[in-house]
Curated annotation (Swiss-Prot):
Entry's Gene Ontology BP terms: retrograde vesicle-mediated transport, Golgi to endoplasmic reticulum; tail-anchored membrane protein insertion into ER membrane
Subunit structure: Interacts with kms1 and sad1.
Keyword Membrane: yes
Signal peptide: none
Membrane found in the keyword field: yes
Localisation per UniProt entry: Membrane
Organism encoding this protein: Schizosaccharomyces pombe (strain 972 / ATCC 24843)
Entry protein name: Sad1-interacting factor 1
Top-level taxon: Eukaryota
UniProt region (Disordered), positions on chain: 16-68
Length: 257
């Protein structure tokens, strides 16, 4: 009985020592005491346990990670400030976000330091604005997707039928084939221009290209794109003129010969 009571007493003492050791380590961590004092306490506790273990039954040894006190005190010299370099790169980057500015609008000094990015950013804004305006204006004028293939198919076969008729008529009536072919082609393209006048292409690509070019060339392209509708109208008028001349040549063949 004495042996059992002695073993129980030793176990209680070991538990109390462990509890004291855990409380001391937590206090040292909070107060930031030196690691030398904590290491001496750990050694003293280990020596006391070694003395008690001589008279007690063998106990499984505890791991060294539990016995050795970790130094959890904060040391500013050992901290690696890796994010500082990333923060510096973020500060010098033109894509950084300004949380204190409304709607995260880039500051003006970013455009002064990066002129290439300024041109690219302005081109993106202009192209997005033109694309939204074009979609808004032509929203009610776009052809449905179901009827678009049918429209292209009709134009294709109408063009083929007209050219076939011209070739047959010129062959049997001994008419010059080349002028009449050009006349019919001009007529067909004129009708296509008249029907598709409201579905013109977008000029956002030319605007983006003009923003990336040097000032003289960019201004020239922007100035030229403003006259694209007039060029389209001139081409349409030229096609209609050729068609009228073809009709005159048909009724008055003496104009050709």
């Amino acid at each position: 009985m004495s042996t059992a009571s002695e073993q129980a007493r030793l176990r209680r003492e070991r538990r109390l020592n462990k509890i004291k050791q855990g409380g001391a380590s937590r206090i040292n961590q909070i107060l930031g005491q030196n690691s030398d004092d904590s290491q001496s306490d750990v050694r003293a506790t280990a020596s006391e346990e070694a003395v008690h273990s001589e008279t007690a039954t063998p106990v499984t040894p505890m791991s060294s990670g539990f016995m050795e006190k970790r130094d959890d005190t904060f040391n500013a010299d050992q901290v690696e400030y890796l994010p500082s370099q990333d923060y510096h790169n973020l500060e010098s980057s033109p894509f950084k976000l300004q949380c204190d500015s409304p709607y995260n609008v880039p500051p003006e000094n970013m455009f002064n330091q990066n002129p290439d990015f300024a041109n690219f950013f302005q081109a993106m804004l202009q192209s997005a604005k033109e694309g939204s305006d074009t979609n808004f204006q032509g929203e009610n004028e776009q052809i449905p997707q179901a009827t678009a293939p049918l429209k292209n198919l009709v134009e294709k076969y109408a063009h083929l039928l007209a050219i076939s008729i011209v070739v047959i008529v010129c062959y049997f009536k001994h008419l010059p084939l080349l002028p009449w072919t050009f006349t019919v082609e001009a007529c067909l393209f004129s009708i296509q221009f008249v029907l598709d006048r409201n579905n013109g292409p977008s000029y956002s690509l030319l605007a983006s290209l003009a923003s990336q070019l040097p000032p003289p060339y960019g201004a020239m392209i922007r100035h030229t794109t403003s006259y694209v509708p007039y060029f389209t109208q001139l081409i349409t008028d030229a096609c209609m003129t050729i068609f009228a001349l073809g009709l005159c040549c048909y009724f008055y063949p003496s104009l050709v010969y």
